[in-house]
Amino acid sequence: GWGAAHILSKQGLGGKIPLSRLLADAIHYAEAGVPVTYSQSSLTAKKREELSPIPGFAKTFLVNGKAPTVGSIFKQERLAKTLRQIAEKGTNDYYRGDLAQLLAKELTDIGSPLRLDDLRRHRAKLIDPLELKHRLGKVYNMIPPTQGVVSLMIIGILDQLNLKRFKVDSAE
């Protein structure tokens, strides 16, 4: 879908930023790493036993078999390599190129029913998003099967409540 969005941006909206630039920050942070947050550390520790049998989980998310510590640097070199290849070869490589072949092989190796042909048949669809008219402007979100409807309902309800009349941290 991101490839179709990038093309739409360039052709229909006058977008000028190349894919390589759009992915540059993600590549940087995947390579250089980001500080591990409390929630990442605690949830990884909590779910470690359940998730460890999943192929690739321990190698990607654990440090010496344990959850990473808060403040340590979490790097994702394989993600950086994948994003760099997408930046160089285009998003189509993920579904129909070298990345697709690698992904299909790894999926087969772990017993997934997805095959290379499934990836090759994938096509993004352009759809009209959900829209909510808000007093501050329009808010957009995705159609089901996402939580888009619920999030727009919450925003709409909050818009009607006039929250400015409440004090911060009040019981109301």
Predicted regions, residues:
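Feature marks proteins synthesized as precursors that undergo proteolytic processing into two chains
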Residues: 1-172
